[in-house]
Each structure stands twice: as structure tokens, then as C-alpha cells.
Design a protein with these regions (language model features):
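Cytosolic catalytic domains that perform sulfur/thiol-centered chemistry
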Residues: 1-195
Length: 195
């Protein structure tokens, strides 16, 4: 994972609520054994509709997905997070996330930013009016700023998850940051346990 303090980008308005992981990436994509190539499966069913927002050329360079409430509900699948990231998104802003999806996001370096619905609606309106609207997510201050509409909103994040983003650590990285303590502990183990 890379260290993230500030995310600056443009957004894409996904005006849908209760988006489940099967809608994010259909189950037939889960048969793959490698961890790459999932971007083509992102919202695959919806992308058949030429009016679907991901097909709108105005948002081709968006790096922040702005969705409705209850994003990522349904079964746990890291593939959903991988598809979102591999498509080019660095963060998802929504009023709420399923717990499992939020945890999968933080473990894989995709920022899950929970804002109040009224703030999300203001961001939707801004990016629909101007696709170049800049969104700044500050992972240190835990704020989202959209200067063009004078919006600054704070979002919650558990301290250990904020620590992951600020320091670029996944589960293995966190474990390795304690390697001296682990080695010290292991050196005190009876030898019959190590043979």
C-alpha cells in the first residue's frame, strides 16, 4: 500500500443506493485466480446501458466515486474493491458503507469516505454541473473539501484505519512493523517448540 495524506481528484456521480457487491462486480468475475484485470468487470451489467454514468466521457478521468447510501452491501468480496481501484478510483464517497466492504477498502488502500447525505447531494450537483470540479480528501484532518461550492465536511474513520492510510500499511506491513518485538518474543520460546 502507498502512503496517502491528501487525495485530490475529480468525481463521478453514481446516484444509486444499496449498491451491492454483485452489482459492483458480478459473480462470474470471481472465478479468476489472479488479482488483476478486474476493471472490465466493474458495474459490468450496468455498463451495457449507454446512459450509465461510467460510459459518460465527461468523467473518464475521475478518481473519486461518489455513490448513494449503503454502498458495498451484500457478500464480502475483495474483488469489488480491486475492480474499483483498477478502474482508477482512489476513494469512494457515500453516506454509508457495509462494514465488510469498508474493511476490505481499508485493507486494500481504497479510501471509504462516509459523508452526510446532504453533503453527497451537493457534491453530486457540483460534479454534474462541472465534471472538472476538484475534490480534496485530507486523510490527516479527515475532511473533504470542494472549494468551488464552499463545502468542507468531516468524515469518521477508525484511528487504526487512518494510521494504515497515513503510513501505507496493509496487514502484513503492520505485522512487520513489530518484527523486533516478534523476534524478541520468539527468542524466549522453549527450544522444543521450534524443532
Amino acid at each position: 500500500m502507498k502512503s496517502v495524506r491528501i487525495l485530490t481528484g475529480t468525481g463521478i456521480p453514481l446516484r444509486r443506493s444499496d449498491v451491492d457487491t454483485d452489482q459492483i462486480i458480478p459473480a462470474d468475475w470471481l472465478k479468476r485466480v489472479e488479482r488483476t484485470g478486474f476493471e472490465a468487470g466493474l458495474f459490468a451489467t450496468w455498463r451495457d446501458d449507454r446512459n450509465f454514468v461510467l460510459n459518460d466521457e465527461r468523467y473518464v478521468s475521475a478518481t473519486i466515486l461518489v455513490a448513494g447510501p449503503s454502498f458495498g452491501v451484500g457478500s464480502s468480496r475483495e474483488h469489488a474493491v480491486w475492480a474499483i481501484q483498477q478502474y482508477g478510483f482512489e476513494a469512494v464517497i457515500a453516506p454509508s458503507f457495509s462494514d465488510i466492504f469498508r474493511n476490505n477498502c481499508t485493507k486494500n488502500g481504497l479510501a471509504p469516505v462516509a459523508l452526510a447525505l446532504d453533503a453527497v447531494e451537493k457534491i453530486w450537483a457540483a460534479i454534474e454541473a462541472d465534471a472538472a470540479t476538484e475534490i480534496v480528501i485530507d486523510m490527516e484532518r479527515l475532511t473533504v473539501e470542494v472549494a468551488s461550492i464552499s463545502l468542507t465536511a468531516s468524515f469518521p474513520m477508525e484511528p487504526q484505519n487512518q494510521y494504515r492510510f497515513l503510513n501505507g500499511l496493509d496487514d502484513i506491513g503492520i505485522t512487520m512493523s513489530h518484527s523486533e518485538e516478534i523476534a524478541s518474543f520468539e527468542s524466549t520460546r522453549p527450544t522444543w517448540l521450534t524443532n
